[in-house]
Amino acid sequence: MTMPTVSMRVNGQLVSHVVEENTLLVTYLRECLGLTGTHIGCDTGQCGACVIHVDGVSKKSCTILAVQADKREITTIEGIAEGDELHPMQQAFHENHGLQCGFCTPGMIMSAIELIEGNRDITELEIRQGLEGNICRCTGYHNIVKAIAAAARSQ
């Protein structure tokens, strides 16, 4: 049996590799492409550390096979900054101390980008509900919520 070839656009670059059928997208991103900003926390879809955008929608990459991402547009945390300039959500996390150890931060940021899209007046409750499925073991989420609200207001 031959292994499938996957082709997708990752952070604006067309990539193509032969993969095993059971390779998770998070594993493909980290091991084949060296994009280690997408973290593996639980490997079961519980923690949100692996959130990326698939065709502009937040998805947990540990729940998607690489073959399911064939011909899709993938954006990881490495693909959101403009050169040396942080993405506004990254900047808001920095300015509002929205991280401690940083392990959950890439997934939080990727989820938050979609969450605030077109919603400058998002409420704290909407932010907290929108982050369900993204776990931070270090903080009480206060500064994360503050950072997301700041990014929403700045768009």
Enumerate the predicted regions with their spans.
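Signature of N-terminal electron-transfer/Fe-S-associated modules in redox systems
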Residues: M1-Q155
